[in-house]
Amino acid sequence: TGTPVKILVVRNILLLLFCLVVLLVFAQSSFLPPCEPVNETVAVEKEGCPKCLVFQTTICSGHCLTKEPVYKSPFSTVYQHVCTYRDVRYETVRLPDCPPGVDPHITYPVALSCDCSLCTMDTSDCTIESLQPDFCMSQREDFPVY
């Protein structure tokens, strides 16, 4: 009579552990901000222009669910999804005090919608640690917000 009771106890413990893992996965994803457009202060600068321009725009930010396999096979590839642009519109700003001969205009993407997908280096910063979006190498010029 002792063996069926032990099997029942082990089964209940395994079921409880499974439920806890599922609960933790859902709890973690509900506390992390989703991938969505957010307002952010960014800086743009251009070689030849003495000042960088700091202004507000909309970027994609948030968390995407990822999977990291325990066993990494040399024959399989792991693709990690990141929060990146889905739909964008482009706007142009003029940098102040650029000397003659230097085009003072910079065009940048404005996020309309975001998506968890593979990182596209053409439109996204996919580095592990990057500079803050409002970092400037040159003198700052804050753009008035209307």
UniProtKB/Swiss-Prot annotation:
Glycans are attached at residue 39. Keywords: Disulfide bond, Glycoprotein, Hormone, Secreted, Signal. It comes from the Eukaryota. Disulfide bonds join 35-83, 49-98, 52-136, 60-114, 64-116, 119-126. GO terms for biological process: G protein-coupled receptor signaling pathway; positive regulation of androgen secretion; positive regulation of estradiol secretion; positive regulation of gene expression. Heterodimer of an alpha and a beta chain. This is Gonadotropin subunit beta-2. The gene is cgbb.
